[in-house]
Amino acid sequence: MSSSNLRVALVGSTGYTALEVARLLLTHPGADLVVATSRQDEGKPLSEIHPMLAGRCDVTLQPLDADVIAKSADVAMCCLPHGASAESVKQLAEAGMRVIDFSADFRLSSLETYQHWYGVKHPWPERIGDVVYGMPEFFADEIRSADIVANPGCYPTSAIMPLAPLVKAGLIETDDIIVDSKSGVSGAGRSPKLGTLYCETNESISAYAVGTHRHAPEIADLVERIAGAPIEVMFTPHLTPMDRGILSTIYVKPVGKAGSVEDAVRAMMSLLRDTYSDQPCVHVVDHLPATKYVAGTNHVQISVRPSGKRAVIVCAIDNLTKGASGAAVQNMNVMFGLPETAGLLM
């Protein structure tokens, strides 16, 4: 630990995303985990909650006190659930800290949309639509000066990355987009639930939250913000019997002027390559992406294929890394002028 390193506080430390943050910071050359909080496990070492950290991280869990944390850390990563997170983010920001929020509390641009989909009263409504969305590939300039960054959702990351450039360029129809996503079980969190028990998930794939998943409005909202055009998206998530990873298969219609579907796909691949040519974490590839190719990394793999009258986009990410904690470390690096990929397995 260097005295000149960035000091990181982890708020809400018992879940998988918190473990992933701690894991990534272990090898970060310019940042150290110095504070970790938990209401239920105060006084315990973080390594007791996450045995993977035994012998490598000796931080003791403490209660959340924003003023105390602000004296010890430069940035807070808030890994609390929606509703509870916004209140803690407010306290930390008012104590003078810069904050990266893992919840959905500040991702959407509309308070009405947030309250409709999440069913809670927002404790800091004046910041809705004001907080920067944490996708450096599109918002790096805003992230550099942000006091709060809304870390993207995992499914939305796998959909926004390929869709936003194509919508912005006018290469696909915007009123008929189908996003079919498969996720590992870690995406459901660490708290025990019937639906994520081994006997329920092993050797089974199941759709869930059909037509009601809260990431659908996030996908539509962010594509419109980036591309400047509204979209209609049908989003269906599935739970798969693997620990981590997301594979999104996205069905789109090329615009009528694009010529053949094959020509349209070539144009899409070319545009995506140009868009992400300088982005270290996003790769437009000729092979079909798979979750195994990006597991444990901050990489995104995207490819496009023709199929009948549609183009089929395939995008793979690790839901815990680029879909959560890796993106947070990437955002932290941008916020504090560190190399963008520092601490990330590249």
From Swiss-Prot:
**Which SMART domains does UniProt cross-reference here?**
Semialdhyde_dh
Q: Which reaction does it catalyse?
A: N-acetyl-L-glutamate 5-semialdehyde + phosphate + NADP(+) = N-acetyl-L-glutamyl 5-phosphate + NADPH + H(+)
Native source organism of the sequence: Rhodopirellula baltica (strain DSM 10527 / NCIMB 13988 / SH1)
Family statement drawn from the similarity comment of this UniProt entry: Belongs to the NAGSA dehydrogenase family. Type 1 subfamily.
Which example biological process does GO assign this protein? L-arginine biosynthetic process
Which keywords fit this entry according to its UniProt record? Answer: Amino-acid biosynthesis, Arginine biosynthesis, Cytoplasm, NADP, Oxidoreductase
Q: Which GO terms describe its molecular function?
A: N-acetyl-gamma-glutamyl-phosphate reductase activity; NAD binding; NADP+ binding
EC number(s) recorded for this UniProt protein: 1.2.1.38
Which SUPFAM superfamilies does the entry mention?
A: Glyceraldehyde-3-phosphate dehydrogenase-like, C-terminal domain, NAD(P)-binding Rossmann-fold domains
- Annotated GO CC locations: cytoplasm
This chain belongs to the protein called: N-acetyl-gamma-glutamyl-phosphate reductase
What pathway, per the record? Answer: Amino-acid biosynthesis; L-arginine biosynthesis; N(2)-acetyl-L-ornithine from L-glutamate: step 3/4
> What start-end ranges are recorded for coiled-coil regions in this protein?
none
The record's section on Gene3D superfamilies has:
Dihydrodipicolinate Reductase, domain 2 (3.30.360.10), NAD(P)-binding Rossmann-like Domain (3.40.50.720)
- Broadest EC class assigned to this enzyme: oxidoreductase
Q: Does the keyword NADP apply?
A: yes
Task: Quote the catalytic residue positions.
Answer: C154
For this UniProt entry, what is the primary localization, expressed as one broad class? Answer: cytoplasm
Indicate where this protein resides in the cell. Cytoplasm
- One Pfam family hit: Semialdhyde_dhC_1
